[in-house]
Amino acid sequence: MPEDVQNRTRIKSERYESGVIPYAKMGYWDADYNVKDTDILALFRITPQPGVDPVEARAAVAGESSTATWTVVWTDLLTACDIYRAKAYRVDPVPGTSDQFFAYIAYECDLFEEGSLANLTASIIGNVFGFKAVKALRLEDMRIPYAYLKTFQGPATGVVVERERLDKFGRPLLGATVKPKLGLSGKNYGRVVYEGLAGGLDFLKDDENINSQPFMRWKERFLYCMEGVNRAAAATGEVKGSYLNITAATMEQMYERAEYAHSIGSVIVMIDLVIGYTAIQSMAIWARKYEMILHLHRAGNSTYARQKNHGINFRVICKWMRMCGVDHIHAGTVVGKLEGDPLMVKGFYNSLLLTHLKINLAEGLFFDMDWAALRKCVPVASGGIHCGQMHQLLYYLGDDVVLQFGGGTIGHPDGIQSGATANRVALESMVLARNEGRDYVGEGPEILRRAAATCGPLKAALDLWKDITFDYTSTDTPDFVEVATESR
């Protein structure tokens, strides 16, 4: 028996120090820890309770999100506890606050089951958010190591393959959500789909809460939607689609709906974030098997992602969903009706689209991270946007995005098809101006005005919505100021 083990186990009183010992003293705080390439790293914003030592608070978060309980247990000696303990290794004050701290915590990769987001999150966010020693806690960012990423499949389709299937390049994709989201009959619902696609959109979609209600059962909706898709595709010569929401009460029902959607020719299905991580991963595996695009609506995310000091930053959700394997996820608009600071949204989009992330504190990216060849996930911009904002949308969000104009299509005074045409003409006019090297952001309103001179639907839309903005201060704003570097 090794001498150190012999010494630890020889006398009962010397085996371990029993009782309640501060987490920092137990080894959950280690300022000298050398981070390994295989470590999973998490960045928490911690607000300790009054009177709680900040060092102890960050050690407590590390302990309660890994191996600790409230008292020392002798069974620690039966494990490689020194390895398996999470290590809080760095702490920084949050700029502009006196009681908040950024705590960097490293987790041994072997603490987590391969390819299981449910298991990863059971530790990282499972119990610690209710811990009394902290007044508030927010998971701001994570670095998932290459070795652990390779146990996840990532998006089944990704940006490049989706564009190839649709034969749409060099511009954002265009979509719309059927409105009203609830109450339409199947036939009227399908008519909305046809009108939007025939007018120039690439996609129509179900909203998050349309499943299989008494006014329209799911199979009826699927059939009428696909009739609209097929007729619009035949009329325009373009590949079209409609996101069919397969969200249901059980996995068996979701598989049934997904398989039926596939059997009638749909190229895309949709799920909601509220179905849970295991269900999302299961549907992503199914989508890859059947070569279907998988769209994820982030329903419910703001219940924990919007508040500044408690919950989970949405950039973490973006990373988790890319790991799970969804092809689309709603990720903010900047200019629409929903929460979205420009820099924060840029951080979300970069987390979904870049192959390698670099530290960018202004965007909320605290770690370098290689995505290990997982495919890109297409961000979706939806919620209170209209064609008069097209120059801003193109500037903030770029090409690899789905722009979804629900009310901005279906609320057009001349009808749904005119609304779709207005959006398509506005987008193509703005992309053309950008490709010509013009200042499309500064000249945006004038570019749209000139395009509207020969497009009645666009003129009507601009006249109707020209003064509509949602200029509210975002709740989640950057903690760090973006600094311009001097060019040399």
From Swiss-Prot:
A cellular component term (GO) from this record? chloroplast
Q: Which SUPFAM superfamilies match?
A: RuBisCo, C-terminal domain, RuBisCO, large subunit, small (N-terminal) domain
Summarize where Mg(2+) binds, as residue positions: K205, D207, E208
Cell compartment(s), UniProt: Plastid, Chloroplast
Q: Where is the active site?
A: K179, H297
Its cofactor is: Mg(2+)
List the Gene3D superfamilies: Ribulose bisphosphate carboxylase, large subunit, C-terminal domain (3.20.20.110), RuBisCO large subunit, N-terminal domain (3.30.70.150)
Which key words are in the record? Calvin cycle, Carbon dioxide fixation, Chloroplast, Lyase, Magnesium, Metal-binding, Monooxygenase, Oxidoreductase, Photorespiration, Photosynthesis, Plastid
Transcription found in the keyword field: no
From which domain of life does this come?
Eukaryota
Q: Which GO terms describe its biological process?
A: reductive pentose-phosphate cycle
Pfam families reported for this sequence: RuBisCO_large, RuBisCO_large_N
Marked site: Transition state stabilizer: K337
Modified-residue entries (N6-carboxylysine), positions? K205
User: Which family does the entry's similarity section mention?
Assistant: Belongs to the RuBisCO large chain family. Type I subfamily.
Other comment:
The basic functional RuBisCO is composed of a large chain homodimer in a 'head-to-tail' conformation. In form I RuBisCO this homodimer is arranged in a barrel-like tetramer with the small subunits forming a tetrameric 'cap' on each end of the 'barrel'.
Function summary: RuBisCO catalyzes two reactions: the carboxylation of D-ribulose 1,5-bisphosphate, the primary event in carbon dioxide fixation, as well as the oxidative fragmentation of the pentose substrate in the photorespiration process. Both reactions occur simultaneously and in competition at the same active site.
Output this protein's name. Ribulose bisphosphate carboxylase large chain
